[in-house]
Amino acid sequence: MLRGYFYAQMREVPLAQVRGRQIAIIGAGFSGSLLAVHLLRRTGPEDRVYLIERSAGFGRGLVYASGNPHHLLNVRAGNMSAFSDQPDHFLEWLRALPENERSAVSVSEDRLTFVSRQLYGSYIQHILGREIWSAESAHRLYLIADEAVALHPAGAGYSLEVAGGLRYEVDAAALAMGNFPPEGDARGYIANPWSQGATADLDSDAPVLLVGTGLTMVDTVISLLDQKHRGPILAISRRGLLPRRHAAVAPHPRFLPAGEAPRSLRALLKTVRAEIRHATALGRDWRAVIDSLRPDTRDLWRNLPLEEKQRFLRHLRPWWDVHRHRMAPSVASRIERALERGQLQIRRARLGRLTPKRGGVEVELLPVAGAPAEQIEAERVINCMGPLSDLSRVAAPLIRGLLASGAVRSDPLNLGIEVSGEGAVIDAAGYAARNLFAVGPLTKGVFWETTAVPDIRVQCERLADHILERVAPKISEDVPAKMGLG
């Protein structure tokens, strides 16, 4: 439905005939799709939103493109509404699905269901599709199935070029490119664990090495188990930590004083540990304490000095990740069973030299405790360290061009793009752009919690308001442009 609408509409709407605001969103995963919806609901009949996505999966992005129904969300369905003012929106959509589409999904009244990422991607596509066909948004949202490769200043706005050679003149642009997959496959080594062939064509009895022990590793193990892999699976990381299991817990009240967030990591850690001890003494679960931090995480992060953030990334991030980003119970049970029978092992080690050999690769493991290096063999090594955040290593031509021109710069922690508190990108000279923005995982270094739906949905709402504050409607000026399919 989405692709058909796009191709039917793009031939007949020359931009020079439009006098409203023209806003481009680059990337159509959750962040870009939801930002588009909020912009459409806040703009008038002459305004246009162009949603640009290089893949065919509008609304899915990297995270929700998984075709494996056993790759589950790590947030309960009751917390996964795309709209903060409609907390049951996702649950209502689930309950309205035909039984044959719900598959094994069980939506209970306690809202604790964990559904597949594949199904959640369908939910986002449903939202996008309904917006396209609504009377209020008709002929105002255009899906461009192409890769944005360049963005150049043009008058008061930008000229956006796509790989197919077309250019679009827009008043503002938002970068919503989500997570960048790692690149650099080699013989016996898979850099991108989300690629379709990551676990394909393996001897079912062959040893596999996974580098990383977080949620990406968990998904990869589930994929291997689903394809009846019987061979040993070794997962390594410097600390050997495994994500904790979700559990049903009663909510814990917010406990940090408003406006008095600690400015040192030591003080913050002391406060949280004390609250966990207090909660435990009352018979409550540590998970509830960690979850109660969600409304405050953005302010906590922004309040920490740069040196404290760097200290967090060096020393505490792995511990935070495994306690904050937990496994769905059914997934945790499968991982635990694989550990109990010895098929899955988790060790503290670092990856050393890889030497291709017949039938696989010889791997040098570097123990973290000073023990001598160890040589093992595996048919395949799969990188499970998560998305690529170092922009200097990202191959996307748009990002490379924006960095080279100085239009954007990496944040000081090298986790993404530096932006203002409102989401305007910061250029190489340190100035906030008037009409270039970023949203979602690209802004992780500034806001930290920008990878989960409950956080991104609020960010998209705020950014939509800010964009429209910065980009005033045009009165009568026609803007020349090239537009169409040929």
Language model region names:
Residues F6-A56, R60-L62, V105-P262, K270-P473, ...:
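Flavin (primarily FAD) cofactor-binding/catalytic cores of flavoenzymes
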Residues G67-H89, P253-A267:
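N-terminal glycine-rich dinucleotide-binding loop that anchors FAD/FMN and/or NAD(P) in oxidoreductases
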Residues V75-L91, R284-T297:
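Short, amphipathic alpha-helical segments
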Residues D85-E109, R298, R302:
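A conserved beta-strand/loop capping segment in the N-terminal third of enzymes
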